[in-house]
């Protein structure tokens, strides 16, 4: 059996229509009121839903704004933190720079004090230097026996000595101390030999040239010769052997000591030293009297030296001539010229007279030039 639902539904609709037609007008009013109430409810519910949606939207919007505000606050706080850190770093750098500036200022003050101290020391030394220089000059004058006008400029001469000093001379300076003792022994031997020599002098040949003493107080004959010479010694015609050397006070150039070896037991000694004022001048001092005939090359100069005990020679041939038997008692200008040609006859001698061997004003003799023949 089959059930027809469509017919049943149509029947139900028909019945409702019939009921509606025969219903009273009051029933129609009630139905309309119900419909209106339902519509109002729906409207109210819709308005509520719309309000709720609006509130939700507003709430969401406010939440977004709050989040944005929070984010902005966080950004502001982070930026403030960065600014504070940068400011702190800048402050630390400024403090370090200030500390460095203070240390530099302290160093500058120290350096200024040192500079001021050095300037004061320099001024004191500059004030003391002339006094020291004067005292040195006075000591040198007392040592050389020179008065008044014979002042020596220590500074300029020291520079010249340093420039003109040869390496051999510098090597010889170091031997001075070890040879002083030997020199004293030689001087004692010389005193004994001179004592014997005085007794034997009468038996010697009268034609043999003798050495004239430069002062009456000395026992030995002593003659001083100054010659311009570049070598360590000048060739004076005799044979010599070096036995000592030392540096004298007031003259940095060493003084060399020689003895005559022409004959055994000859008491003649010579001392050789550079001049303090002019390093090109070689000062030779001869002491004693030869106990043998002189060589041919030495006789002429021996006779010349006997007439003028203090001589300055200016020779272009480095004094290949003769013998001189002397050292400087007083140092100053006397001049003999020797041309290279040995046959040249005219010689000029300018001699000086002195009051003593170690002191004196330099007074020229009345006969300044003596002409003599070879």
From Swiss-Prot:
DNA-binding region: 229-295
SS bond partners: none
GO cellular component: nucleus
PROSITE patterns found in the cross-reference section: WRKY
Compartments (UniProt record): Nucleus
Record's compositionally biased regions (Polar residues): 363-374
Keyword Transcription regulation part of the UniProt annotation: yes
Chain coiled-coil ranges: 87-121
Gene Ontology MF term list: DNA-binding transcription factor activity; sequence-specific DNA binding
Region (Disordered): 40-90, 157-201, 355-374
Listed Basic and acidic residues bias regions: 40-62, 161-193
Keywords associated with the record: Coiled coil, DNA-binding, Nucleus, Transcription, Transcription regulation
Composition bias type Acidic residues, residue spans: 63-77
Induction section of the entry: Induced by potassium deprivation.
Function statement: Transcription factor. Interacts specifically with the W box (5'-(T)TGAC[CT]-3'), a frequently occurring elicitor-responsive cis-acting element.
Protein name: Probable WRKY transcription factor 9
Source organism of this protein record: Arabidopsis thaliana (Mouse-ear cress)
Gene symbol of the encoding locus: WRKY9
